[in-house]
């Protein structure tokens, strides 16, 4: 129970003259003091000003503010004229959902409104699980999270447990994961080098196999956390690095050179389609109606950030890892845009083609039938 105690009365002049108090008191009874009227006014104000949108409740009483993701219910009211006003709200615990995403500025931007309680959440609370994409991919194979970001490559291994959400995509539209090195290498040379990769379930790794025309077992690679790939190349652990995230904008600062942009290559080979890198998925344990409600909430969060870009970018800066505001804003714009609000026909086709080619070349075990929340 959440108990709200009435404060001190404003004085006799605060009496409403019965307009508010009348419905709550015997109309034949006179107001004995301002406190009784204050109670009635408080209740009327609460009932008028409570904003309840399926779990979003804001109740204001004077200078005090109550924000609870609860359904409002008045269990009992003290009608004693000289007692403090007592208003009880029965608390209906909102459903808590785990939401996995990477600690990167684009994901932080996307979920700004959820992190700061800026939009209605339709009876849900979101527990943000911040982990690198390879870890999230692995957790998704075990069905551990309610909603999570995954690599599109990983979707091929979790489609029995998760459905794709229509929003939340990260598309490389004329850009994407990059191969960098201390000196320029061409494809035939790279195929013979040791490559530092950010994870075997990342879309970058699948794109690399498609670009090389070889399955992973036929070339040399080492898995390195994505934020340590520069160091791996510079220290000689690997000769080539497959970089994702903001490394695509900062590799020159590390005195490395670009060998290939896999997003550019993919677009040339596939009629200008974007390279599908990541998406959000929802656990199939939820019924269709619940999936849709959650999906709409996540889409609303993305739309809010796009509509309030400056403040959302400021929030995202805390995850920017050595990027200034301008660079972080550029990175966010690369991966949170119209593709993120909805894949659209081209976005869906790019996933079909990406996973279809992977299956035809024996890089994933099953042909995929995409299942989207609608």
Regions found by a protein language model. Give the residues of each.
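Secondary-structure end/capping motifs
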Residues: 286-357
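Cysteine-centered motifs
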Residues: 15-16, 21, 37, 54
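Beta->alpha turn/N-cap motifs
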Residues: 132-134, 143-156, 225-226, 243-249
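Bilobed "Venus flytrap"/periplasmic-binding protein-like clamshell domains
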Residues: 93-116, 130, 177-240, 244-249, ...
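Pocket-lining segment of extracytoplasmic ligand-binding domains
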Residues: 225-318
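Extracytoplasmic small-molecule ligand-binding "clamshell" domains
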Residues: 106-110, 119-151
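Short, positively charged and aromatic/hydrophobic N-terminal segments
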Residues: 23, 42-45, 71, 76, ...
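Hydrophobic/proline-rich hinge and linker segments of small-molecule sensing/allosteric domains
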Residues: 164-187, 266-285
């Amino acid at each position: 129970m959440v108990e709200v105690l009435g404060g001190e009365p404003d004085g006799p002049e605060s009496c409403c003259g019965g307009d508010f108090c009348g419905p709550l008191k015997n109309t034949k009874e006179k107001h004995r003091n301002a406190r009784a009227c204050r109670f009635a006014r408080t209740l009327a104000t609460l009932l008028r000003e409570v904003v309840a949108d399926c779990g979003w409740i804001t109740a204001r009483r004077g200078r005090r503010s109550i924000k609870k993701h609860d359904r409002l219910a008045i269990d009992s009211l003290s009608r004693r004229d000289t007692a403090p006003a007592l208003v009880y709200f029965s608390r209906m615990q909102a459903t808590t959902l785990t939401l996995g995403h990477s600690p990167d500025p684009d994901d932080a931007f996307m979920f700004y409104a959820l992190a700061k309680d800026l939009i209605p959440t339709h009876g849900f609370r979101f527990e943000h699980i911040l982990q690198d994409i390879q870890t999230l991919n692995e957790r998704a194979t075990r069905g551990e999270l309610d909603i999570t970001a995954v690599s599109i490559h990983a979707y091929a291994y979790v489609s029995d447990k998760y459905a794709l959400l229509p929003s939340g995509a990260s598309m490389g539209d004329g850009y994407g994961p990059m191969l960098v090195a201390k000196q320029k290498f061409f494809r035939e040379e790279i195929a013979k080098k040791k490559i530092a990769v950010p994870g075997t379930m990342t879309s970058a790794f699948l794109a690399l196999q498609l670009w090389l025309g070889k399955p992973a077992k036929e070339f040399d690679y080492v898995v390195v956390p994505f934020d340590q790939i520069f160091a791996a190349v510079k220290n000689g652990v690997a000769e080539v690095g497959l970089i994702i995230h903001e490394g695509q904008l900062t590799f020159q600062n590390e005195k490395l050179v670009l060998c290939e942009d896999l997003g550019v290559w993919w677009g040339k080979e596939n009629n200008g389609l974007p390279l599908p890198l990541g998406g959000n998925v929802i656990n199939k344990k939820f019924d269709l109606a619940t999936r849709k409600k959650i999906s709409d909430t996540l889409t609303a969060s993305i739309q809010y950030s796009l509509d309030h870009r400056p403040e959302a970018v400021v929030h995202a800066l805390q995850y920017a890892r050595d990027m200034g505001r301008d660079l972080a804003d550029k990175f966010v714009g690369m991966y949170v845009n119209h593709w993120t609000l909805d894949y659209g026909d081209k976005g869906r086709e790019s996933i079909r083609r990406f996973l279809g080619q992977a299956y035809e070349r024996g890089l994933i075990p099953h042909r995929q039938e995409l299942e989207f929340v609608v």
